[in-house]
Amino acid sequence: MPHILILNGPNLNRLGKREPDVYGTDTLTDLEQRLFQFAEGIQTELTFFQSNHEGDLIDALHEAEEQYDGIVLNPGAFSHYSYALRDAVAAISIPVIEVHLSNPHAREEFRHRSVIAPVARGQITGLGFEGYKLAISYFMNTNNK
């Protein structure tokens, strides 16, 4: 059974409270429950991890290489400036899909650039929780690591 890591970065623990006009009122727990149900239906195992700390996310990426078939990464604001996180994604051999709940290109100018995207397998933005499902589906529909 494929095993996917769902890695959420800073402020995603505040889903449901932070900017509900942008991110909605559903919580991180709601997201995890929906993804867990989705994964059961397609026989995929998911592991969830969230941190507001760059080093914790980097450690999780390094450790993931031996444990997972793919990573769905929502780096939050780190996507715009964390070269350390970018280098961690580039340094591992398993594919990473960058996901954002909102569309950063439709928001403030500083959000328009991702330093992660050039080293990720792909990027899905602006589709809310559905973006995570699409990323998981990608891993299920491809055999390449």
Curated annotation (Swiss-Prot):
The keyword Amino-acid biosynthesis applies. Transmembrane segments: none annotated. It is an enzyme of class 4 (lyase). Coiled coil: none annotated. It comes from the Bacteria. Gene3D superfamilies: Dehydroquinase, class II (3.40.50.9100). Homododecamer. Belongs to the type-II 3-dehydroquinase family. This is 3-dehydroquinate dehydratase. It comes from Bacillus licheniformis (strain ATCC 14580 / DSM 13 / JCM 2505 / CCUG 7422 / NBRC 12200 / NCIMB 9375 / NCTC 10341 / NRRL NRS-1264 / Gibson 46). The gene is aroQ.
